[in-house]
């Protein structure tokens, strides 16, 4: 395996770890810890967390796209094995879901917090939560496909 492939794989997996790990932390650790807070405290905190986390995910998505495309080409391109195509397809779906969260739902959260419309903000955060669960499941499935495709 050449150095370029090793570096690309490292960066790819780092991006995946940041994205999936962040979603797992947010859903299973942060969300339950914030449940007892009033909406006036909880929603501005979510807005702040989302703002920071989505920047990290945005960088991760770019890194994953670039390195994933490079790796796919190195391992056969259109003739690559089905697990590589499955990972690419699921990854693109996850990126589209993230795009919807970042560019459609997050602005709703931000507007609701700025206007102190707590029910609107809570609805938007609830939709983000459900889509994060979907993306987490898709990410775990993708990791499973990656492990199974290695032929250990």
Where are these regions (language model features)?
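Polytopic transmembrane helical bundles with strong interfacial aromatic enrichment
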Residues: 1-152
């Amino acid at each position: 395996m050449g150095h370029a492939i090793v570096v690309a794989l490292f960066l790819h997996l780092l991006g995946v770890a940041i994205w999936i790990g962040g979603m797992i932390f947010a859903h299973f650790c942060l969300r339950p810890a914030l449940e007892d807070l009033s909406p006036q405290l909880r929603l501005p905190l979510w807005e702040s967390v989302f703002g920071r986390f989505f920047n990290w995910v945005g960088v991760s998505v770019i890194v994953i796209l670039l390195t994933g495309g490079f790796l796919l080409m190195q391992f056969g391109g259109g003739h690559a094995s089905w697990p590589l195509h499955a990972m690419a397809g699921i990854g693109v779906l996850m990126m589209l879901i993230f795009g919807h969260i970042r560019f459609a739902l997050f602005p709703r959260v931000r507007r609701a917090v700025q206007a102190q419309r707590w029910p609107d903000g809570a609805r938007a955060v609830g939709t983000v939560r459900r889509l994060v669960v979907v993306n987490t499941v898709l990410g775990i499935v993708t990791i499973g496909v990656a492990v199974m495709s290695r032929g250990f």
